[in-house]
């Protein structure tokens, strides 16, 4: 079993307006620098899959060895969703499912990469920030699309970066993980800074646009969703 959750940041029975206020309070708890002497041997991806029009979340973690990028552990959970889909409040809809999977992990990752935003968020409190606080682990947001901000020209070569600006502040980085392919948008979550977040995303994205952490977690939760649907058809 993985570690317990941080109770002060696991309030889900809130309205959207209450969630916004909670995000503002939680933002004050973020630490945007890695722990001193952080040694990363295991890095995880967290993801959730849902079916349109239904209120079930299929969540999972896959933990990879950082040297081989081979999976060493995984966990999954199926949870009923209670919070509506509201842009900017994704964590309140998705984290209860991801948290249930976290509690079933038998190997603690040193870093978690979320398929979503960290500080590149209207209130600087995306799912990677909330999740990092909840699990007490260094966390990174790596998103396929922008929620806020703009960036300047980005080179075509792998490893090219451009600061993501929002309201005069650098909130993340556009990162080219594969030559000639659309960038991903990287931002720190908790116990993380932007340069280190970019470094780790590039390290675990040797071939494809998305990090291997996200690719493995995405396959896991989609397989879980499909299996659930097939089981329902047999009933």
Curated annotation (Swiss-Prot):
User: What are the site positions for Interaction with target DNA?
Assistant: 85
The organism is Myxococcus xanthus (strain DK1622)
Q: Which residues bind Mg(2+)?
A: 47, 115
Answer whether the UniProt record assigns the keyword Hydrolase to this protein. yes
Q: Which cofactor does it need?
A: Mg(2+)
Keywords on record: Cytoplasm, DNA damage, DNA repair, Endonuclease, Hydrolase, Magnesium, Metal-binding, Nuclease
What is this protein's function?
Answer: DNA repair enzyme involved in the repair of deaminated bases. Selectively cleaves double-stranded DNA at the second phosphodiester bond 3' to a deoxyinosine leaving behind the intact lesion on the nicked DNA.
Catalytic reaction list: Endonucleolytic cleavage at apurinic or apyrimidinic sites to products with a 5'-phosphate
Question: Which GO molecular-function terms appear in the entry?
Answer: deoxyribonuclease V activity; magnesium ion binding; RNA endonuclease activity, producing 5'-phosphomonoesters; single-stranded RNA binding
Record protein name field: Endonuclease V
Gene Ontology cellular-component terms listed: cytoplasm
The compartments listed are: Cytoplasm
**Primary site of residence:** cytoplasm
């Amino acid at each position: 079993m993985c570690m317990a959750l941080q109770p002060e940041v696991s309030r889900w029975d809130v309205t959207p307006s209450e969630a916004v206020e909670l995000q503002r309070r939680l933002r004050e708890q973020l630490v945007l620098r890695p722990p001193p002497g952080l040694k990363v041997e295991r890095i995880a991806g967290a993801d959730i899959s849902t079916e349109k029009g239904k209120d079930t979340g299929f969540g999972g973690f896959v933990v990879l060895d950082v040297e081989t990028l081979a999976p060493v552990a995984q966990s999954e959970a199926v949870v009923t969703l209670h919070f509506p889909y509201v842009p900017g409040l994704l964590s309140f809809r998705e984290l209860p499912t991801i948290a249930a999977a976290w509690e079933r992990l038998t190997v603690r990752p040193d870093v978690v990469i979320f398929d979503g935003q960290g500080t590149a968020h209207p209130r600087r409190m995306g799912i990677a920030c909330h999740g990092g606080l909840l699990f007490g682990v260094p966390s990174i947001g790596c998103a396929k699309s922008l929620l806020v901000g703009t960036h300047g020209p980005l080179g075509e070569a792998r490893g090219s970066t451009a600061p993501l600006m929002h309201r005069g502040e650098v909130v993340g980085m556009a990162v080219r993980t594969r030559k000639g392919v659309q960038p991903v948008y990287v931002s720190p979550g908790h116990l993380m800074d932007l340069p280190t977040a970019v470094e780790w995303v590039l390290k675990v994205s040797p071939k494809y646009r998305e990090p291997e952490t996200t690719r493995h977690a995405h396959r896991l939760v989609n397989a879980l969703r499909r299996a659930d649907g097939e089981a329902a058809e047999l009933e």
